[in-house]
């Protein structure tokens, strides 16, 4: 894979420093400006404070970029041009048309693996959408998690999804799901989902050993680490479900499908909750980035 590295990321790779990949769909499509830019900066700062180097991924004028300069991140955040939401399947088109866009979980997993970066932080992964038995809307993220040796840190799957079916598909794909200090799957805005987890890691060193065993010893694909969102900004699950049901009904009436569902959901949920979901999203992004930075350092130390 032909990647363009920022100078900071290139130096970190050459020096063997721990790195954490970041997706940018949340910047280009997921959050409003200027909250999206503030979130990107906060995540990068959390990673640096943990002792690792942030490596945001994006497609800039057809180039697959690992590590962004400030003007490039601002370009994605301001959205003054048409920005693609780039998943793995979209690489060829984005490159050939010299497009610019934010990367999803699947795209970031592939780019991180190609760059030799073993840890990636995001808000929540994609998965099986509600009503998938009718429209078969299933994210590429799960296939990427199964394929690429990257430790993905998240607050569970996005709330809009069918969480039980997403967990079943992760199991079918052979992706281990690890609860970080929890026995229950977090559900993005909420600390719980009612879905028990089989595996748990109570400290970063244990989490790092699991990743190293999977990547180095077994030569297998990714690991999913689920971190409960901060308690002070999390929302009750039943409250979130009521808003999701109403928002999805609105999306259906408006004919919103596929990639457009999640940005619509995030925007409408923020309106319905008076900004509570936006606050929760910003907090969990930074919280995940902090743990990912610690995990990257522990992974490097274990080597």
UniProtKB/Swiss-Prot annotation:
Function: Catalyzes the reversible cleavage of pseudouridine 5'-phosphate (PsiMP) to ribose 5-phosphate and uracil. Functions biologically in the cleavage direction, as part of a pseudouridine degradation pathway.
UniProt source species: Myxococcus xanthus (strain DK1622)
Enzyme Commission number(s): 4.2.1.70
Record keywords: Glycosidase, Hydrolase, Lyase, Manganese, Metal-binding
Gene behind the chain: psuG
Binding note for cofactor: Binds 1 Mn(2+) ion per subunit.
Domain of life: Bacteria
Name the UniProt record assigns to this protein: Pseudouridine-5'-phosphate glycosidase
Family: Belongs to the pseudouridine-5'-phosphate glycosidase family.
């Amino acid at each position: 894979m032909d990647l363009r590295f920022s100078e900071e990321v290139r130096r970190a790779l050459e020096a063997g420093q721990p790195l954490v990949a970041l997706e940018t769909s949340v910047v280009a499509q997921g959050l409003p400006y200027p909250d999206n830019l503030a979130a990107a900066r906060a995540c990068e700062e959390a990673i640096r404070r943990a002792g690792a180097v942030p490596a945001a991924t994006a497609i800039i004028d057809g180039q697959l970029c690992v590590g962004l300069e400030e003007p490039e991140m601002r370009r994605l955040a301001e959205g003054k041009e048409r920005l693609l939401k780039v998943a793995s399947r979209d690489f060829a088109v984005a490159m050939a048309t010299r497009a610019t866009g934010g990367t999803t979980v699947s795209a970031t997993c592939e780019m991180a693996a190609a760059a030799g970066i073993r840890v990636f932080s995001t808000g929540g992964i994609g998965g099986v959408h509600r009503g998938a038995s009718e429209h078969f809307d299933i994210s590429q993220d799960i296939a990427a998690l199964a394929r690429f040796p990257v430790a993905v840190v998240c607050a569970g799957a996005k709330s809009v999804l069918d969480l039980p079916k997403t967990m079943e598909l992760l199991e079918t794909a052979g992706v281990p799901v690890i609860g970080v200090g929890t026995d229950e799957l977090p559900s993005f805005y909420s600390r719980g989902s009612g879905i028990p987890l089989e595996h748990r890691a109570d400290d970063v060193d244990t989490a790092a050993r699991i990743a190293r065993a999977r990547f180095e010893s077994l030569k297998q694909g990714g690991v999913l680490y689920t971190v409960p969102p901060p308690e002070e900004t999390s929302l009750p699950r039943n409250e979130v479900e009521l808003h999701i049901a109403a928002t999805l009904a609105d999306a259906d009436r408006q004919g919103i499908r596929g990639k457009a569902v999640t940005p619509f959901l995030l925007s409408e949920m923020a309106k319905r909750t008076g900004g509570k979901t936006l606050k929760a999203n910003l907090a969990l992004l930074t919280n995940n980035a902090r743990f990912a930075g610690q995990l990257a350092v522990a992974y490097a130390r274990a080597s």
